[in-house]
Swiss-Prot record:
The gene is lrp. It comes from the Bacteria. InterPro entries: CdaR-like_regulators (IPR051448), Homeodomain-like_sf (IPR009057), PucR_C-HTH_dom (IPR025736), PucR_C-HTH_sf (IPR042070). This is Leucine-rich protein. Not essential for viability or growth. Nevertheless, uncontrolled production in E.coli is detrimental to the normal physiology of the bacteria.
Length: 282
Protein backbone atom coordinates (compact mmCIF):
# COMPACT_ATOMS: atom_id res chain seq x y z
CA UNK A 1 0.00 0.00 0.00
CA UNK A 2 1.06 3.61 -0.60
CA UNK A 3 1.05 6.53 1.83
CA UNK A 4 -2.12 7.88 0.20
CA UNK A 5 -3.95 4.75 1.31
CA UNK A 6 -3.04 5.40 4.95
CA UNK A 7 -3.36 9.20 4.79
CA UNK A 8 -6.11 10.13 2.27
CA UNK A 9 -5.95 13.80 3.36
CA UNK A 10 -2.28 14.19 2.40
CA UNK A 11 -1.25 16.42 -0.49
CA UNK A 12 1.87 16.55 -2.64
CA UNK A 13 3.72 19.66 -3.82
CA UNK A 14 7.11 20.92 -4.99
CA UNK A 15 7.85 23.01 -1.87
CA UNK A 16 7.54 22.68 1.93
CA UNK A 17 4.66 24.54 3.58
CA UNK A 18 5.03 27.37 6.07
CA UNK A 19 1.69 26.51 7.69
CA UNK A 20 2.17 25.22 11.27
CA UNK A 21 -1.01 23.15 10.92
CA UNK A 22 0.70 20.89 8.39
CA UNK A 23 3.73 18.58 8.52
CA UNK A 24 5.90 18.61 5.37
CA UNK A 25 7.93 15.50 4.57
CA UNK A 26 10.48 15.36 1.75
CA UNK A 27 10.11 12.41 -0.60
CA UNK A 28 12.56 12.45 -3.51
CA UNK A 29 12.27 15.79 -5.31
CA UNK A 30 8.85 16.65 -3.88
CA UNK A 31 7.14 17.17 -0.51
CA UNK A 32 4.27 15.29 1.08
CA UNK A 33 2.01 17.39 3.34
CA UNK A 34 0.01 15.92 6.24
CA UNK A 35 -2.67 17.93 8.11
CA UNK A 36 -1.89 17.70 11.84
CA UNK A 37 -5.61 17.65 12.64
CA UNK A 38 -5.93 14.27 10.91
CA UNK A 39 -2.90 12.66 12.60
CA UNK A 40 -2.92 10.68 15.82
CA UNK A 41 -0.23 11.32 18.43
CA UNK A 42 1.55 8.15 17.33
CA UNK A 43 1.46 9.16 13.66
CA UNK A 44 2.78 12.63 14.44
CA UNK A 45 5.58 11.10 16.53
CA UNK A 46 6.54 8.77 13.68
CA UNK A 47 6.69 11.67 11.26
CA UNK A 48 8.81 13.71 13.65
CA UNK A 49 11.25 10.83 14.11
CA UNK A 50 11.34 10.07 10.37
CA UNK A 51 10.10 7.25 8.18
CA UNK A 52 13.03 5.48 6.52
CA UNK A 53 13.49 7.08 3.13
CA UNK A 54 11.35 10.08 4.09
CA UNK A 55 12.98 13.21 5.47
CA UNK A 56 10.87 15.37 7.74
CA UNK A 57 11.51 18.99 6.92
CA UNK A 58 12.23 20.73 10.21
CA UNK A 59 12.85 23.61 10.15
CA UNK A 60 11.95 25.23 6.83
CA UNK A 61 14.91 25.60 4.51
CA UNK A 62 14.55 29.09 3.04
CA UNK A 63 15.84 32.07 5.07
CA UNK A 64 13.00 34.11 3.58
CA UNK A 65 10.46 31.56 4.82
CA UNK A 66 11.94 31.60 8.31
CA UNK A 67 11.99 35.39 8.41
CA UNK A 68 8.58 36.14 6.89
CA UNK A 69 6.54 33.19 8.13
CA UNK A 70 8.24 32.13 11.38
CA UNK A 71 9.69 35.49 12.54
CA UNK A 72 13.13 33.90 12.86
CA UNK A 73 16.51 35.15 11.71
CA UNK A 74 17.10 37.92 9.20
CA UNK A 75 16.28 38.30 5.51
CA UNK A 76 19.20 37.23 3.29
CA UNK A 77 19.15 40.64 1.58
CA UNK A 78 16.92 43.63 0.91
CA UNK A 79 16.09 45.04 -2.51
CA UNK A 80 15.46 48.59 -3.64
CA UNK A 81 11.94 47.49 -4.62
CA UNK A 82 10.17 44.40 -3.29
CA UNK A 83 6.79 43.07 -4.36
CA UNK A 84 4.73 40.04 -3.36
CA UNK A 85 2.37 38.26 -5.73
CA UNK A 86 -0.13 35.99 -3.99
CA UNK A 87 -1.92 33.01 -5.48
CA UNK A 88 -4.98 31.42 -3.88
CA UNK A 89 -5.71 27.86 -5.00
CA UNK A 90 -7.89 24.93 -3.96
CA UNK A 91 -5.04 22.52 -3.18
CA UNK A 92 -1.25 22.32 -3.22
CA UNK A 93 0.11 23.71 -6.49
CA UNK A 94 1.38 21.09 -8.97
CA UNK A 95 5.11 21.26 -9.72
CA UNK A 96 4.44 21.94 -13.43
CA UNK A 97 2.34 25.01 -12.60
CA UNK A 98 4.97 26.33 -10.18
CA UNK A 99 7.64 25.92 -12.87
CA UNK A 100 5.49 27.79 -15.39
CA UNK A 101 4.89 30.68 -12.98
CA UNK A 102 8.61 30.86 -12.25
CA UNK A 103 9.23 31.47 -15.94
CA UNK A 104 6.50 34.10 -16.23
CA UNK A 105 7.16 36.24 -13.15
CA UNK A 106 10.13 38.52 -13.76
CA UNK A 107 12.63 39.11 -10.96
CA UNK A 108 11.35 36.21 -8.86
CA UNK A 109 13.48 35.79 -5.73
CA UNK A 110 11.73 33.05 -3.75
CA UNK A 111 8.50 31.06 -3.58
CA UNK A 112 6.75 31.10 -0.20
CA UNK A 113 4.19 28.30 0.32
CA UNK A 114 2.05 29.89 3.04
CA UNK A 115 -0.50 27.07 3.25
CA UNK A 116 -2.03 24.36 1.08
CA UNK A 117 -4.30 27.01 -0.47
CA UNK A 118 -2.07 30.10 -0.60
CA UNK A 119 1.36 30.73 -2.10
CA UNK A 120 3.35 33.97 -2.30
CA UNK A 121 6.05 34.92 -4.80
CA UNK A 122 8.62 37.51 -3.67
CA UNK A 123 9.94 39.62 -6.54
CA UNK A 124 12.99 41.88 -6.37
CA UNK A 125 11.41 44.41 -8.73
CA UNK A 126 8.01 45.86 -9.54
CA UNK A 127 5.92 43.80 -11.95
CA UNK A 128 5.15 45.75 -15.12
CA UNK A 129 1.59 46.41 -16.25
CA UNK A 130 2.35 44.46 -19.44
CA UNK A 131 3.26 41.34 -17.44
CA UNK A 132 0.17 41.75 -15.26
CA UNK A 133 -2.06 41.88 -18.33
CA UNK A 134 -0.38 38.72 -19.65
CA UNK A 135 -0.96 36.93 -16.34
CA UNK A 136 -4.58 38.07 -16.26
CA UNK A 137 -5.19 36.73 -19.76
CA UNK A 138 -3.49 33.45 -18.94
CA UNK A 139 -5.36 32.67 -15.70
CA UNK A 140 -8.41 31.04 -17.37
CA UNK A 141 -6.08 28.80 -19.42
CA UNK A 142 -4.11 27.78 -16.33
CA UNK A 143 -7.33 27.00 -14.47
CA UNK A 144 -8.50 24.82 -17.35
CA UNK A 145 -5.17 23.04 -17.89
CA UNK A 146 -4.55 22.27 -14.21
CA UNK A 147 -8.15 21.89 -13.02
CA UNK A 148 -7.75 24.55 -10.31
CA UNK A 149 -9.68 27.70 -9.44
CA UNK A 150 -7.03 30.42 -9.11
CA UNK A 151 -7.07 33.96 -7.73
CA UNK A 152 -3.95 36.08 -8.17
CA UNK A 153 -3.41 39.16 -6.00
CA UNK A 154 -0.61 41.55 -6.93
CA UNK A 155 0.71 43.25 -3.80
CA UNK A 156 2.15 46.74 -3.73
CA UNK A 157 5.68 47.51 -4.92
CA UNK A 158 7.49 48.54 -1.72
CA UNK A 159 10.39 50.96 -2.27
CA UNK A 160 13.39 51.08 0.07
CA UNK A 161 11.56 49.70 3.12
CA UNK A 162 13.26 48.25 6.20
CA UNK A 163 13.18 44.50 6.82
CA UNK A 164 10.66 44.76 9.65
CA UNK A 165 8.39 46.98 7.57
CA UNK A 166 8.53 44.56 4.64
CA UNK A 167 7.42 41.72 6.92
CA UNK A 168 4.57 43.81 8.37
CA UNK A 169 3.39 44.71 4.88
CA UNK A 170 3.60 41.06 3.81
CA UNK A 171 1.50 39.94 6.77
CA UNK A 172 -1.13 42.64 6.26
CA UNK A 173 -1.34 42.00 2.52
CA UNK A 174 -2.06 38.34 3.38
CA UNK A 175 -4.74 39.46 5.85
CA UNK A 176 -6.15 41.90 3.30
CA UNK A 177 -6.52 39.19 0.66
CA UNK A 178 -8.08 36.74 3.13
CA UNK A 179 -10.60 39.35 4.30
CA UNK A 180 -11.45 40.27 0.70
CA UNK A 181 -12.02 36.67 -0.42
CA UNK A 182 -14.36 36.04 2.52
CA UNK A 183 -16.77 38.59 1.05
CA UNK A 184 -15.91 38.58 -2.65
CA UNK A 185 -15.53 35.84 -5.23
CA UNK A 186 -12.08 35.20 -6.62
CA UNK A 187 -11.16 33.66 -9.94
CA UNK A 188 -9.31 36.63 -11.45
CA UNK A 189 -6.33 38.91 -11.07
CA UNK A 190 -6.70 41.43 -8.25
CA UNK A 191 -4.61 44.58 -8.01
CA UNK A 192 -3.45 46.11 -4.74
CA UNK A 193 -5.34 49.37 -5.32
CA UNK A 194 -8.55 47.50 -6.17
CA UNK A 195 -8.51 45.50 -2.93
CA UNK A 196 -7.42 48.50 -0.83
CA UNK A 197 -10.35 50.46 -2.25
CA UNK A 198 -12.62 47.71 -0.99
CA UNK A 199 -10.94 47.81 2.45
CA UNK A 200 -11.54 51.56 2.80
CA UNK A 201 -15.18 51.31 1.72
CA UNK A 202 -15.78 48.34 4.04
CA UNK A 203 -13.95 50.02 6.96
CA UNK A 204 -11.22 47.38 7.26
CA UNK A 205 -8.11 48.42 9.21
CA UNK A 206 -4.52 47.63 8.20
CA UNK A 207 -2.22 49.83 10.33
CA UNK A 208 1.12 48.96 8.70
CA UNK A 209 -0.19 49.60 5.19
CA UNK A 210 -1.81 52.84 6.33
CA UNK A 211 1.46 54.06 7.87
CA UNK A 212 3.34 53.44 4.65
CA UNK A 213 0.95 55.40 2.47
CA UNK A 214 0.53 58.19 5.00
CA UNK A 215 4.16 59.13 4.30
CA UNK A 216 3.18 60.15 0.76
CA UNK A 217 -0.54 60.83 1.02
CA UNK A 218 -1.46 63.38 3.67
CA UNK A 219 -2.92 66.91 3.48
CA UNK A 220 0.56 68.44 3.90
CA UNK A 221 2.23 66.38 1.15
CA UNK A 222 3.09 67.79 -2.27
CA UNK A 223 1.03 65.08 -3.92
CA UNK A 224 -2.23 65.97 -2.16
CA UNK A 225 -2.95 68.82 -4.60
CA UNK A 226 -1.94 66.63 -7.55
CA UNK A 227 -4.30 63.84 -6.51
CA UNK A 228 -7.22 66.22 -5.99
CA UNK A 229 -6.57 67.94 -9.33
CA UNK A 230 -6.26 64.64 -11.20
CA UNK A 231 -9.49 63.43 -9.64
CA UNK A 232 -11.31 66.65 -10.57
CA UNK A 233 -10.04 66.42 -14.16
CA UNK A 234 -10.88 62.69 -14.45
CA UNK A 235 -7.22 61.78 -14.94
CA UNK A 236 -6.61 64.15 -17.87
CA UNK A 237 -2.94 65.17 -17.57
CA UNK A 238 -3.14 68.29 -19.75
CA UNK A 239 -6.08 69.75 -17.84
CA UNK A 240 -4.54 68.72 -14.51
CA UNK A 241 -1.28 70.52 -15.37
CA UNK A 242 -3.26 73.63 -16.32
CA UNK A 243 -5.21 73.50 -13.06
CA UNK A 244 -1.94 73.24 -11.09
CA UNK A 245 -0.21 75.92 -13.21
CA UNK A 246 2.71 73.64 -14.04
CA UNK A 247 4.14 72.22 -17.27
CA UNK A 248 2.84 68.81 -18.33
CA UNK A 249 6.40 67.42 -18.20
CA UNK A 250 6.73 68.60 -14.59
CA UNK A 251 3.49 66.84 -13.74
CA UNK A 252 4.70 63.65 -15.42
CA UNK A 253 7.93 63.80 -13.40
CA UNK A 254 5.94 64.10 -10.17
CA UNK A 255 3.76 61.13 -11.14
CA UNK A 256 6.76 58.96 -12.05
CA UNK A 257 8.56 59.78 -8.80
CA UNK A 258 5.41 59.13 -6.78
CA UNK A 259 4.90 55.78 -8.53
CA UNK A 260 8.44 54.72 -7.65
CA UNK A 261 8.13 55.75 -4.00
CA UNK A 262 4.55 54.64 -3.27
CA UNK A 263 3.87 51.93 -5.85
CA UNK A 264 0.76 53.79 -7.06
CA UNK A 265 0.39 54.77 -10.72
CA UNK A 266 -2.08 57.64 -10.62
CA UNK A 267 -2.85 57.37 -14.34
CA UNK A 268 -4.55 54.07 -13.45
CA UNK A 269 -8.11 54.75 -12.30
CA UNK A 270 -8.09 52.33 -9.33
CA UNK A 271 -4.80 53.74 -8.06
CA UNK A 272 -6.10 57.30 -8.36
CA UNK A 273 -9.38 56.40 -6.63
CA UNK A 274 -7.53 54.72 -3.76
CA UNK A 275 -5.20 57.71 -3.33
CA UNK A 276 -8.14 60.13 -3.38
CA UNK A 277 -10.21 58.18 -0.82
CA UNK A 278 -7.13 57.64 1.35
CA UNK A 279 -6.62 61.42 1.53
CA UNK A 280 -10.27 61.93 2.44
CA UNK A 281 -10.16 59.30 5.19
CA UNK A 282 -6.74 59.93 6.71
Amino acid sequence: MELKDYFPEMQVGPHPLGDKEWVSVKEGDQYVHFPKSCLSEKERLLLEVGLGQYEVLQPLGSPWQRYLLDHQGNPPQLFETSQFIYLNHQQVLPADLVELLQQMIAGLEVILPISTTQTAFLCRQATSIKVLRSLEGLLPTLESDFGLALTMFVGNAWYQVAAGTLRECFEEECQLLTAYLKQKSGGKLLTFAEVMLWSILSHQSFPALTRQFHQFLNPQSDMADVVHALWSEHGNLVQTAQRLYIHRNSLQYKLDKFAQQSGLHLKQLDDLAFAYLFLLKY
